[in-house]
Amino acid sequence: MKAGIHPNYRTVVFHDLSADTYFKVGSTINTDRTIELEGESWPYVTLDVSSASHPYYTGKQKEFSKEGSTARFQQRFGRFFTGNK
């Protein structure tokens, strides 16, 4: 490997703000912020969404049949389409 052309790979602490969860992951992200965690100082990056807070991974997904655009259409105009012709 050539010296000086590769990014600095190191362990970084990612903090999911919405779930208040911390992850230690190897990354090449640049950050000047640090955090004291488990008695050591680590580079620190904040996240809005991660697997700890994303609806797909937490199982708190919305059902399209109840909350989708088709359901909204049925609520607004369903009375006009009662099936009587």
Swiss-Prot record:
InterPro entries, from UniProt?
A: Ribosomal_bL28/bL31-like_sf (IPR034704), Ribosomal_bL31 (IPR002150), Ribosomal_bL31_B (IPR027493), Ribosomal_bL31_sf (IPR042105)
Q: What is the top-level taxon of the source organism? A: Bacteria
Q: Which keywords does this Swiss-Prot/TrEMBL entry list?
A: Ribonucleoprotein, Ribosomal protein
Keyword Transmembrane recorded:
no
Q: Which GO terms describe its molecular function?
A: structural constituent of ribosome
Might you name a Gene Ontology BP term for this protein? translation
- What's a Pfam family in this record? Ribosomal_L31
Q: Which GO terms describe its cellular component?
A: ribonucleoprotein complex; ribosome
Quaternary structure, per UniProt, is: Part of the 50S ribosomal subunit.
Q: Of which family is this protein a member?
A: Belongs to the bacterial ribosomal protein bL31 family. Type B subfamily.
Instruction: Cite the HAMAP family for this sequence.
Output: Ribosomal_bL31_2
Its recorded name reads Large ribosomal subunit protein bL31B
Q: Gene encoding this chain?
A: rpmE2
